[in-house]
């Protein structure tokens, strides 16, 4: 039935887009206030956002209900919005203004390449009937990225000159 396909794709798009917008507003506001009290506030805020994507990936992988899928979309959108709102501000804590465009370009390019790789991988998992397990495995990768972020990102200033 075509109407269920349209409704489900529209619902997922709206869910993730709206929740990402909420995440951007929440993440930006929290980060701007937190960094005034703790120089790692932006890093911690980004980590909270990244952390929210972990249960969303697990829900996508193992959830079998409408509520689980919508909940996963909400968590992913809010988490990704919080994380994404803080990428450039965190970059500014480490990279001089002379090199920010280059650094941000490299960061974006890396994200595009990772997205292409993951899309291909998700396609293979889908073909093999293992998409749910694949999403759960992505949660492990995100957890490792979160640990790396928290361990290595130790800014000395809010704005590297």
Predicted regions and their residues:
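Hydrophobic core of transmembrane alpha-helices in multi-pass small-molecule transporters
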Residues: 66-82
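Short, small-residue-biased leader/transition segments that mark boundaries at the very start
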Residues: 1-8
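Intracellular juxtamembrane helix-capping segments at the cytosolic ends
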Residues: 82-95
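Cytoplasmic membrane-interface "Motif A"-like loop-to-helix N-cap segments
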Residues: 32-49
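A membrane-interface helix-boundary motif in multi-pass transporters
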Residues: 41-44, 121-141
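A late C-terminal transmembrane helix in Major Facilitator Superfamily
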Residues: 24, 92-128
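Multi-pass alpha-helical transporter architecture, strongest
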Residues: 56, 60-62, 137-161
């Amino acid at each position: 039935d075509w109407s269920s396909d349209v409704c489900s794709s529209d619902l997922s798009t709206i869910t993730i887009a709206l929740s990402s917008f909420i995440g951007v507003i929440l993440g930006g506001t929290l980060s701007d206030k937190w960094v005034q009290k703790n120089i790692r506030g932006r890093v911690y805020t980004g980590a909270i956002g990244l952390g929210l994507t972990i249960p969303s990936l697990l829900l996508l992988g193992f959830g079998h209900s409408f509520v689980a899928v919508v909940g996963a979309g909400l968590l992913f959108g809010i988490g990704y919005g919080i994380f994404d709102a803080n990428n450039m501000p965190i970059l500014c804590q480490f990279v001089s203004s002379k090199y920010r465009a280059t650094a941000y370009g490299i960061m974006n390019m890396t994200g595009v390449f990772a997205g292409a790789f993951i899309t291909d991988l998700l396609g293979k998992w889908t073909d093999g009937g293992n998409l749910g397990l694949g999403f759960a495995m992505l949660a492990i990768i995100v957890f490792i990225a979160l640990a790396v972020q928290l361990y290595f990102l130790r800014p000395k200033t809010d704005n590297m000159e």
